Each structure stands twice: as C-alpha cells, then as structure tokens.
C-alpha cells in the first residue's frame, strides 16, 4: 500500500466557487464516510493558507491585490496552501502521493489575470515552491479538464523542464488530426466523447511521453467538468475518473517513485463526486476497497 495524503480545508467546501466547484464538500465527505481516514496509510491534512510571498513566485503583486478585493481570497489561499503542503510532503517522502481538494479552479490563472473561476494557478505554484525549497527541477502536468489550460501554458511556455499535456476543449475530436504540438514539452490532445475514448486517448498519449521526459514528480489536474451532468463536454460518467487515476498513477510508479499529486475542485454534481472521490483515494493508497 501507498501512503496517501488528502489535503482539504472546510473553507474550500463552504466557500467554494459554487457554480464551478459543485461537489467539493460532498466529495471530501464521501472519502471520510467510506472509512479511508481510519486506514493507517491515508491521512487528512488541513490545507494551510499560502503566503503572499509564495503566491508571488508566479503572480504579480498587482494581481494579488486584485484578488484580495474579491470574496474568493481566503478560499484561494487555502487551495494554494493545500497544493504547497502536498508538494512538500510528497517530495520529502513523508507520503507517497496526494489528493488536493480545492475550492476554486486554477489553470486559467496567468501572472496578472485570470478567468473561469480561477484566481491563482494552484498546480503551477507547486513548481516554483518545489524548486525554491526542495531541490526539485523537472515536472509533468497532465490536465484532463474540458477547457484548455491557458494559464499553465502561458506560465511555463518557455520552461522545458515542465512537460504539459492538455486534453482540452479546443481540440475535442477523437482523431489524431486534432493534436497540437506547440513544442516537445507543450502539447494538446483531444479529450474523448465517451469513457472509452477518453481512456484510450490518455493511454495513448500520457505514459510514453512521461517515460521519455522522466519528471521527478507528476501533477494531474482531474477536471470533472467532463462529466455528463456537468457544464463542460458532458461526455463522461463518474466511472471514468478512477480509471484515469489508475493510468496516471501507474506511470508515476514506474517513472518517479510514485510521486503524484492529484488536484481537483470536484466540478461536477455531488452524485458524481461522491462516487469518484473515494475511488481515486482507493487507487492512490492501494487499499483494494473496491476491487
């Protein structure tokens, strides 16, 4: 079994950007109700607040000050803080992998602007934090949200030590002709129009590219707006997300000693997050509960 951390603060559920993060509290509660926090290898860590200095590694002070004026300031701090805490504990070897449950999005956040329920770039902020404090250089980000991760791409476009694989709405066909290769480390691929095509596309593109790139850690943005009852492609069922977790965890185990952080804001209805959340934790922690 693996040691798995779940990073979450109650504010991320109660103050979630609710039109986007529809099932945050229910997703976390389902993990608890299924008994995972009674297992010796699964632990809940309350997400701390990130500091302005930590956020300032990627975002301008002007943008930080703008976010302060919004009602999403505190939930954004805890969302980023959970990611930083998970990054620290995984890279220090205190846990093997982690699930970070945020109350806001992140991948549409640029240095000094954002849109789409995003304020700070939650996953991306883990990378300069790891580089500054944990002597880690090389990362892969896999994004299976329905929308293009324009903020992540913008922040790391010139950084060849970050592999960014995005399965995004801009190229949503089930054909190779939709692929867009911006560079050897920045690429977009189509997401699927069903569980089967989504799994096929991720299996086709992710493992081999990550094995070739050899990151020291993998981040996976598990966007659930691809769910058939959410606001995105409305293509997938809740059964797809644990299967994606298995694929991405498998390559992390092979390439970087299992160092994997899954970030989600559970942007799907509660019935979907209640199903997917505990099964993703089961996959990460290798408990075999649903085998």
For each predicted feature, which ranges?
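N-terminal low-complexity, Ser/Thr- and acidic-residue-enriched intrinsically disordered segments
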Residues: 1-56
